[in-house]
From Swiss-Prot:
<keyword id="KW-0929">Antimicrobial</keyword>
<dbReference type="GO" id="GO:0005576">
    <property type="term" value="C:extracellular region"/>
</dbReference>
<feature type="disulfide bond">
    <location>
        <begin position="23"/>
        <end position="29"/>
    </location>
</feature>
<keyword id="KW-0044">Antibiotic</keyword>
<dbReference type="GO" id="GO:0042742">
    <property type="term" value="P:defense response to bacterium"/>
</dbReference>
<comment type="similarity">
    <text>Belongs to the frog skin active peptide (FSAP) family. Brevinin subfamily.</text>
</comment>
<keyword id="KW-0878">Amphibian defense peptide</keyword>
<protein>
    <recommendedName>
        <fullName>Brevinin-2Rd</fullName>
    </recommendedName>
</protein>
<dbReference type="InterPro" id="IPR012521">
    <property type="entry name" value="Antimicrobial_frog_2"/>
</dbReference>
<keyword id="KW-1015">Disulfide bond</keyword>
<dbReference type="Pfam" id="PF08023">
    <property type="entry name" value="Antimicrobial_2"/>
</dbReference>
<keyword id="KW-0964">Secreted</keyword>
<comment type="function">
    <text>Antimicrobial peptide.</text>
</comment>
Length: 29
């Protein structure tokens, strides 16, 4: 459903942000 799609989008966005943050913190960008 729509709610499931939104939840998946939110999860993906959060994962991308976490990856970018950890990348910057570790200096491996």
């Amino acid at each position: 459903g729509i709610l499931d799609s939104l939840k998946n989008l939110a999860k993906n966005a959060a994962q991308i942000l976490l990856n970018k943050a950890s990348c910057k913190l570790s200096g491996q960008c």
